[in-house]
C-alpha cells in the first residue's frame, strides 16, 4: 500500500471538504467509504425523470453556500459541473406513487 498523509473515513460533505482542502495544500489523501457511492447525505440520484438529479437527503445547502468551504472550493466545484438551481419552492416530498408535495 502506498503511504498517504491522511486517511479519511466516510465520504459525507465534511469529509470531502476536508479531503479537498488537504489535497489542495499538497497533502496526499485517501477517502474510505463503505457504500458503493460517495456523498453521504449529499448523494445525488435520478428519482423522478431521466436526467433530472435530486439531492435526496440534503435539506438545505445554505450553510455550505454561505460558509468558508464554498468560498474556498466553489470555483473548482463549478469547473467540475456543480451548479445550484434556485427555486421559490426549494423542497418537496416525493411519494411512492410518483406524486409530490
Name these PLM-found stretches.
Residues 3-101:
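N-terminal glycine-rich phosphate/pyrophosphate-binding loop and immediately adjacent elements
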Amino acid at each position: 500500500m502506498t503511504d498517504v498523509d491522511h486517511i479519511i473515513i466516510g465520504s459525507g460533505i465534511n469529509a470531502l471538504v476536508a479531503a479537498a482542502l488537504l489535497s489542495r495544500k499538497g497533502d496526499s489523501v485517501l477517502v474510505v467509504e463503505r457504500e458503493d457511492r460517495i456523498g453521504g447525505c449529499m448523494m445525488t440520484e435520478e428519482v423522478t425523470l431521466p436526467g433530472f438529479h435530486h439531492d435526496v437527503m440534503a435539506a438545505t445547502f445554505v450553510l455550505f453556500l454561505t460558509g468558508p468551504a464554498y468560498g474556498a472550493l466553489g470555483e473548482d466545484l463549478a469547473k467540475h459541473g456543480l451548479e445550484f438551481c434556485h427555486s421559490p419552492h426549494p423542497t418537496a416530498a416525493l411519494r411512492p406513487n410518483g406524486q409530490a408535495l
